[in-house]
């Protein structure tokens, strides 16, 4: 997201600022995930040294070149999928994991946080989409990016154990 923000032109400064703010949110999210992982017995070393599965590699291979393009507004489609998924499913997943694995709230804090806070992330996205900067061409690219990211997210799960 920070890479994408650095490629948004000054004419779209409010969008650039939103991307930068969102990058900070996502950085804190990763720290929360790391804490949860350690709380269930994992280590930061494992996170740093375990290779990505092929679905994660595919997602990164798609996202980073997109973020490096001028005014990568199509990545709003990725945000729509990612934030929408968290908004709709994270609470259910937190409760299911707690029940099935007998976990404490502090071991699923990332999922619990998103159950309560992805509405604000999603609202920011909605504001951008309603701002008037999204032309027909941009809208088409946003939709295509959303479809690709949704498929690559599914691929990450399908390839969970395939490094």
Q: How should each PLM-predicted stretch be described?
A:
Residues 1-163:
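Non-heme di-metal
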């Amino acid at each position: 997201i920070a890479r994408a923000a650095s490629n948004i032109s000054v004419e779209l400064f409010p969008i650039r600022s939103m991307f930068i703010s969102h990058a900070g949110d996502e950085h804190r999210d990763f720290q929360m995930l790391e804490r949860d992982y350690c709380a269930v017995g994992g280590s930061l070393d494992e996170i740093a040294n375990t290779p990505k599965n092929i679905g994660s590699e595919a997602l990164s291979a798609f996202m980073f070149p997109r973020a490096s393009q001028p005014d990568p507004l199509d990545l709003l489609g990725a945000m729509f999928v990612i934030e929408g998924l968290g908004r709709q499913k994270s609470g259910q997943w937190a409760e299911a994991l707690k029940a099935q694995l007998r976990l404490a709230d502090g071991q699923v804090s990332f999922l619990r946080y998103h159950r309560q806070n992805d509405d604000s992330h999603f609202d920011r996205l909605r504001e951008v989409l309603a701002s008037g900067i999204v032309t027909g061409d941009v809208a088409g690219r946003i939709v295509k990016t959303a479809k690709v990211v949704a498929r690559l997210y599914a691929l990450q799960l399908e390839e969970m154990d395939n490094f």
